[in-house]
From Swiss-Prot:
Annotated ATP binding sites: 12-19
Function: Catalyzes the specific phosphorylation of 1,6-anhydro-N-acetylmuramic acid (anhMurNAc) with the simultaneous cleavage of the 1,6-anhydro ring, generating MurNAc-6-P. Is required for the utilization of anhMurNAc either imported from the medium or derived from its own cell wall murein, and thus plays a role in cell wall recycling.
Domain of life: Bacteria
Gene expressing this chain: anmK
Top-level EC class as recorded in UniProt: transferase
The keyword Membrane belongs to this UniProt entry's keyword annotation: no
Reaction equations catalysed: 1,6-anhydro-N-acetyl-beta-muramate + ATP + H2O = N-acetyl-D-muramate 6-phosphate + ADP + H(+)
InterPro entries per record: Anhydro_N_Ac-Mur_kinase, ATPase_NBD
Family affiliation: Belongs to the anhydro-N-acetylmuramic acid kinase family.
Name of protein: Anhydro-N-acetylmuramic acid kinase
An example molecular function term from Gene Ontology annotations: ATP binding
Keywords recorded for this protein, A-Z: ATP-binding, Carbohydrate metabolism, Kinase, Nucleotide-binding, Transferase
Length: 371
């Protein structure tokens, strides 16, 4: 059978770089042909994080970063195609999520909800010679939805089972769950912080980009008073559909919570407590929405041993596994999802799940940008 090749490009809330995946959709189960990760240059990451924080942000800075990210995404795609010896002419489309700078969905207090991703798809298409699908979230928002999470439709397509209840937990900067009951309807939402707070805290205190394996967290002790303050964030009490981002969970908020404790906490204790926050908020969502389901972890959090241990502790019903056990490496699930969403766009098939996002109907997502 002739390959059906698409490229997925993903930059998540962690704002640490680019995951790019070459996927063949010609068979019932998607095949990962090749994949690469490209770290953001330091100055690009600083610009992204700067524009993620509400301030007197310059339009000039936004416009330039939009194009610079487009160039980086194109470079990542071209590198992957070269290393897999795949001609650009064989690729049907690139699906590029872009870099989220602001996510203000329905319920966040804004009269006109919006979700903003940058990474110019015109630049990507021009520099790769490949049609590029981008701007996936705003149609769902226009239909009254959260615009997130968008991966549940892909999760259902590749991880759904007619015999086993599953819950797919994607732990990136933000954590989200997709409930896949056997022979029933999909549910899902963002549960709260994933890696974002843990990454920001270790970078501020240790100079590391992330807590490898959760090793630093394991040297600390859970601080119960701090955990209780963190869990008072109003997001956790909101009903689904709901989605969140850095706007809700960031270092400014964390510092305010630390100030409330009136305690001089060792930084490793804070890290251990942030790990617990992610584990509790995620497993609370699983227990509420899909109790007794098999819990499958993907995203960067799948490599945090300390976090997985705490998740298993709070959700002992079934062994916690990673998506590797279902045939897809945890690192590449999201990039593959946006390759799949690009395929859905070319086929004029819906990519959202209204039961998850709250949109008024299913919709074809994304715009097509030709070379």
């Amino acid at each position: 059978m002739k390959p059906s090749l698409f490229v997925g490009v993903m930059s998540g809330t962690s704002a640490d770089g680019i995951d790019v995946a070459l996927v063949d959709f010609s068979q019932a189960t998607p095949a990962l042909v090749g994949s690469e990760s490209h770290a953001y240059p330091n100055h690009i990451r600083e610009h992204v994080l700067g524009l993620c924080t509400p301030a007197n942000n310059e339009i000039d800075a936004l416009g330039q970063l939009d194009v610079e990210l487009g160039k980086l995404y194109a470079h990542a795609v071209n590198s992957l195609l070269a290393n897999t010896q795949t001609p650009a002419a064989q690729i049907q489309a690139i699906g590029c999520h872009g870099q989220t700078l602001r996510h203000r969905p329905l319920g966040s207090g804004y009269a006109s909800p919006f979700s903003l991703q940058i990474g110019d798809p015109n630049t990507i298409a021009a520099l790769t010679g490949i049609a590029t699908v981008a701007d996936f979230r705003r149609k769902d928002v226009a239909l009254g939805g959260q615009g997130a999470p968008l991966v549940p439709a892909f999760h259902a397509a590749v991880f759904g089972s007619t015999t086993t209840d599953r819950c797919i937990a994607n732990i990136g900067g933000i954590a989200n769950i997709t409930c896949l009951p056997a022979n029933s309807h999909i549910a899902g939402y963002d549960t709260g912080p994933g890696n974002a707070l843990m990454d920001a805290w270790i970078e501020a205190n240790q100079g590391a980009k992330y807590d490898a394996g959760g090793a630093w967290a394991q040297t600390g002790k859970l601080n119960q008073p701090l955990l209780e303050i963190l869990l008072q964030h109003p997001y956790f009490a909101l009903p689904a559909p709901k989605s969140t981002g850095r706007e809700d969970f960031n270092m400014t908020w964390l510092q305010a919570c630390l100030n409330q404790t009136n305690l001089p906490l060792p930084p490793e204790d804070v890290q251990a407590t942030l790990t617990e926050l992610t584990a509790i908020s995620l497993t609370d969502g699983v227990k509420r929405s899909c109790p007794n389901a098999e819990l499958v972890i993907c995203g960067g959090g799948a490599f945090n041993t300390a976090l997985l241990e705490r998740i298993q502790h709070h959700y002992p019903q079934k062994p916690t596994v990673t998506s590797q056990q279902l045939g897809i490496a945890p690192t590449w699930v999201e990039a593959m999802a946006f390759a799949w969403l690009a395929m859905r766009r070319l086929e004029n098939q819906p990519g959202n799940v209204p039961a998850v996002t709250g949109a008024s109907r299913e919709a074809v997502l994304g715009g097509i940008y030709t070379p």
